[in-house]
Amino acid sequence: MRILLTNDDGIHAEGLAVLERIARKLSDDVWVVAPETDQSGLAHSLTLLEPLRLRQIDARHFALRGTPTDCVIMGVRHVLPGAPDLVLSGVNSGANMADDVTYSGTVAGAMEGTLLGVRAIALSQEYEYAGDRRIVPWETAEAHAPELIGRLMEAGWPEGVLLNLNFPNCAPEEVKGVRVTAQGKLSHDARLDERRDGRGFPYFWLHFGRGKAPVADDSDIAAIRSGCISMTPLHLDLTAHKVRAELGAALGVEA
């Protein structure tokens, strides 16, 4: 099985090293094409206004000055000697759940794999802070992901669907199981902090937070909060089919 790895935290991210160890428990044919720099929050964006610069680190490790989407395209269309059987994107430092999947470069890497006709999985590890220090239990994803991915590859899933895995913030032995979940919902709390530079011109920092909101029992959020691994199947068809039919009926047009 040929596996292509990418992420959005960059080629030097600890989570990418974790992902490679996970992948090597599944196959010896593992390739890495990851961003040269941190691309967090760039979602499913492409680099169109400047050239892509590819740097070969060794036989199967490459860094690209581009987004996670660029990396998957580069891997599938140029770097690999043949099509991969699986694209793995991650392991992200921090969960990618609920509405955050729309911002996530990690999820976007799996999206692009899916668009290119390759089975794809995004992996993210929840964390906590101890003072100003981020504590990420990478060992949890590393311990549980290989078997879970192996089982998923045996079971298979439909074309046009990617899988979004989130691992809870706990030790490997404290994980309470796996739940197949729905994408949850979080409330937005985005604020702009306006400041002035040395010449008096304004600039802004975006403070992106979340407010309180009800959490559905079957959601990815609920699974992670309960200490379970969350597995959410996401499809690329964004059509709201029920609303499409309702609008057609309301307007008296074909839908």
From Swiss-Prot:
Q: What is its main location?
A: cytoplasm
Give each disulfide bond as a residue pair.
Answer: none
Keywords recorded for this protein, A-Z: Cytoplasm, Hydrolase, Metal-binding, Nucleotide-binding
Q: What cofactors does the UniProt entry give for this protein?
A: a divalent metal cation
* Cofactor binding, note field: Binds 1 divalent metal cation per subunit.
Residues binding a divalent metal cation: 8-9, 40, 92
Catalysed conversion reaction: a ribonucleoside 5'-phosphate + H2O = a ribonucleoside + phosphate
For this protein, the record's InterPro entries field holds: SurE, SurE-like_Pase/nucleotidase, SurE-like_sf
Decide whether keyword ATP-binding is in the record. Answer: no
Instruction: Check the record and name the NCBIfam families matching this protein.
Output: PRK00346.1-4 (NF001490), surE (TIGR00087)
User: Record's PANTHER family?
Assistant: 5'-NUCLEOTIDASE SURE (PTHR30457), 5'_3'-NUCLEOTIDASE SURE (PTHR30457:SF12)
Sum up the protein's function in the record's words.
Nucleotidase that shows phosphatase activity on nucleoside 5'-monophosphates.
Q: What is this protein called?
A: 5'-nucleotidase SurE
The organism named in the record is: Brucella abortus (strain S19)
Show the taxonomic lineage: Bacteria, Pseudomonadati, Pseudomonadota, Alphaproteobacteria, Hyphomicrobiales
